[in-house]
Curated annotation (Swiss-Prot):
Region (PAZ domain): 181-284
The protein's enzyme class: hydrolase
Membrane-crossing residue ranges in chain numbering: none
Organism annotation: Synechococcus elongatus (strain ATCC 33912 / PCC 7942 / FACHB-805)
Function: A DNA-guided ssDNA endonuclease that might play a role in defense against invading mobile genetic elements. Uses short ssDNA sequences as guides (gDNA) to bind complementary target strands, resulting in cleavage of the target DNA (tDNA). The cleavage site is 10 nucleotides (nt) downstream of the target residue base-paired with the 5'-end of the gDNA. Both 5'-P and 5'-OH gDNAs confer activity; a 5'-OH guide cleaves between nt 10-11 and nt 11-12. Guide DNA mismatches in the seed (nt 2-9) can enhance activity, mismatches 1-5 nt after the cleavage site block activity.
Annotated protein name in UniProt: Protein argonaute
Gene: ago
GO molecular function, one term: DNA binding
Region (N-terminal domain), start-end ranges: 1-94
Domain of life per record: Bacteria
Subunit structure comment from the entry: Copurifies with SSB proteins Synpcc7942_0079 and Synpcc7942_0301 as well as other proteins.
């Protein structure tokens, strides 16, 4: 069955610009094997190898369990106090090999970073999502500024290689949020706006600014804090490091922790020797601060509007930057041209409500009913006041949906503020009592500034086997907000508002599982999984495994997959013919190998794909308006197939406005399996349109990954994985 012949062709423009084809010397590297005196703990080897790369005096890259460089490492650099490198000779790299291509991209990125860093008028930083941030420092780079904040114009720049060895620049507009203030100044002015990350405002030995995770502010003085390991006070230490007497004397002690240390202890620092790492969220909170003047608030709102640049603005600016870099860095005088590719437009998914009635969006279930019914008894807890009435629009919505499904709901179990105990033990008993009465899902109305702890309520309820849907009382819910609250409540009660019409193809996967990991910077919550059938029917979520590194445990993946296969059997009375396993982010070496081998023994086919939220750049289309060539966002469902790299990039969402903002495509890599890329693309795209918890919007990620992602974050917040044993896996507690 030829899918491609039935798809509409489309011409796509990317924010990528051709640089050169790699030469034989570009593809040659020195290879070293690392011998550790003590075997690294599980999950630590890659981090240790990466740290060794910075100590070799040459640009070095990790590849598998080895290290490669473009120039020979000097003999005196081949050994550290607990490791030793052994040269294995030269290695010829091949761009058709994913690991080799990734290593070559890292080399090219490091070379580009070195060259861009040569200018005194700009700075280069590594971007959190990959690539480089190149921005203009000083007054010349400021686009907007206010009291303690600046927005600098810059570019996010990355490199990419295709399987043929062609090197491309990928360039996008980037705005860097920056504060010239110290932590001391920030907390004096905005004490209610929390800090997450801070940085030294002085250079370290490597001429960089060290970043920290922010801990807490104290009233302690630097001269009173003794650094036992150095035999001096905190004040003396900073004076020795170049601090002025004024900086030290006027500072309080703050506590910070290295970002890269999962179990790092808090370290004492000075409030005037640190600056906050300003984020868009912090700037938004400044605009909400009652002490900030109206003019300042207008300036901040203008910032948020100005950074949402259209694809046309982005591609035109990227083209100028690419031409400059080609000339200055690569010695290429020809102008940069955005890369054009042949693409396809995938057909939209067909959504189904009750009795397989077709709907265009999830909101239509209000008139059609839900595809599958769950619990019919609900609790209501009003922690806003002592009124027993449900929020009017939510109540109406629940009754309308129930009517369309020809059933009655039990909504009589209601409690108010005066019923809720203050003592922790009594609160736990409150939830246990409700659970014993058959209530397993509760709508909780409480204001954001309530003295009751939302997270504590959630955990106490989960311990009793109850899922909670929270709602703020003000402003009062209109029918749109009420519908989304109702959908969240129903999903947590095991309902399935909508399903999909299965893709009509013999090779389609009949069980799809999404995997994600979250971290609290000490432990990773991995193997959080969510599964659906080909028609979108939910098989629920699975408990995560707590692990040390971001690499999934192969055994934990198999345990999760096998549980979900058994669920599939219980529903379909057979084993699945094919699985599609989706991994959020990079698939690490060996993660899925055990599962693949065991499925082979059962003659169950499997495909593994990694879904990456970054690295796909921007996708646009050329159109003519008033006789001029302009760019517009590629239509939702647009896909570019890249068979040589076993990958595809696709548009799964749209900006709210055609003239403000631009969408971010997904990049999907086919890590294992024999299914055609176009079928994987179609099934992936249809799963992004399945969003039972939102009436009017689809997901950017496929639904199984969206839920796995939300679940991993929820499990991370809960922290106590054992409490999840009491709650049904059919209840989507993370929506």
């Amino acid at each position: 069955m030829d899918l491609l012949s039935n798809l509409r062709r489309s011409s796509i423009v990317l924010n990528r610009f051709y640089v050169k084809s790699l030469s034989q010397s570009d593809l040659t590297a020195y290879e070293y094997r690392c011998i550790f005196k003590k075997t690294p703990e599980l999950g630590d080897e890659k981090r240790l190898l990466a740290s060794i790369c910075y100590k070799l005096g040459a640009i070095a890259v990790r590849i598998g369990s080895n290290i490669i460089t473009k120039e020979a490492v000097r003999p005196e650099k081949l050994q550290g106090h607990d490791w030793q490198l052994v040269q294995m000779g030269t290695k010829q790299l091949d761009c058709r090999n994913d690991a080799h291509r990734c290593a070559l991209e890292t080399f090219e990125r490091k070379f580009l970073e070195r060259d861009l860093s040569a200018s005194s008028q700009t700075e280069v930083r590594k971007a959190a999502e990959g690539g480089l941030i190149w921005w203009v420092v000083g007054a010349k780079g400021i686009e907007k500024s206010g009291n303690g904040w600046e927005v600098h114009r810059g570019r996010r720049i990355d490199v990419s290689l295709d399987a043929e060895g062609n090197l491309y620049l990928e360039i996008d507009i980037h705005h860097r949020f920056y504060t010239p203030w110290t932590v001391h100044q920030w907390l004096e002015q905005y004490p209610e706006i929390p800090l997450s990350y801070v940085r030294n405002n002085y250079l370290d030995e490597r001429h960089g600014f060290i970043n920290w995770q922010y801990g807490r502010f104290t009233q302690e003085r630097p001269q009173d804090i003794l650094l036992d390991c150095l035999g001096m006070s905190l004040a003396e230490y900073h004076l020795n490091k170049g601090a002025t007497e004024e900086e030290v004397q006027q500072s309080y002690v703050v506590y910070v922790k290295p970002i890269s240390w999962r179990k790092g202890k808090l370290t004492a620092h000075l409030s005037r020797r640190l600056s906050p790492s300003l984020t868009m969220e912090m700037l938004a909170k400044v605009a909400e601060d009652s002490t900030v003047c109206d003019r300042e608030k207008r300036e901040i709102r203008a910032v948020f509007k100005s950074i949402k640049q259209s694809i046309n603005q982005r591609l035109q600016e990227a083209q100028k930057t690419a031409s400059w870099i080609l000339t200055k860095t690569y010695g290429i005088s020809s102008p940069a041209i955005a890369l054009s590719c042949d693409g396809y437009l995938l057909p939209a998914a067909k959504l189904l409500a009750a009795n397989k009635q077709p709907v265009s969006k999830t909101a239509d279930i209000r008139n059609k009913g839900c595809a599958k019914i769950g619990e019919t008894s609900f609790g209501y807890l009003n922690l806003y006041n002592n009124q027993l009435q449900y929020p009017l629009e939510v109540h109406k919505c629940l009754l309308e949906i129930a009517n369309k499904n020809n059933l009655q709901l039990s909504l009589d179990q209601r409690r108010v503020l005066s019923d809720y105990p203050q003592d922790d033990l009594d609160q736990q008993m409150f939830w246990q009592t409700w659970s014993s009465q058959g209530i397993k899902t509760v709508l909780v109305v409480m204001p954001w500034d309530s003295h009751h702890d939302k997270q504590k309520i959630r955990i106490q309820a989960i311990q009793a086997g109850i899922a909670t849907q929270f709602m703020v009382p003000l402003p009062k819910a209109d029918k749109y907000k009420a519908l989304n609250v109702t959908l969240g409540l129903l999903c947590k009660a095991g309902w399935q508002p909508i399903q999909l019409e299965s893709v009509d193809h013999p090779e389609v996967a009949d069980l799809i599982i999404g995997f994600d990991t979250g971290t609290n910077r000490e432990l990773y919550y991995g193997t959080s999984a969510f599964a659906v059938l080909a028609d979108g029917q939910s098989l629920g979520w699975e408990l995560p495994a707590v692990q040390r590194g971001e690499t999934f445990s192969g055994q934990a993946i198999w345990q999760t997959v096998s549980k979900l296969i058994i669920k599939f059997y219980q529903i379909c009375q057979r084993y699945p013919q094919k699985l599609l396993l989706m991994r959020d982010g990079l698939v690490q070496e060996g993660e899925f190998q055990q599962t693949i081998e065991l499925l082979k023994e059962r003659k169950i086919a499997v495909d593994v794909i990694s879904v990456r939220k970054s690295g796909a750049g921007r996708m646009g289309q050329e159109i003519y308006e008033n006789g001029q060539l302009v760019y517009r966002d590629a239509a939702i469902g647009s896909v570019i197939l890249q068979p040589a790299e076993r990958s595809f990039i696709m548009v799964t969402s749209q900006p709210v406005s055609k003239t403000i903002g631009s969408i971010r495509p997904l990049r999907i890599v086919h890590e294992y399996g024999s299914t055609d890329l176009e079928l994987l693309a179609l099934q992936t795209y249809h799963l992004t349109q399945l969003h039972p918890a939102s009436g009017f919007r689809s997901c950017r990620l496929p639904w199984v990954l969206h839920l796995a992602d939300r679940s991993s974050k929820e499990f991370q917040r809960i922290g106590q994985i054992s409490v999840l044993q009491n709650i049904s896996r059919d209840k989507l507690i993370a929506v």
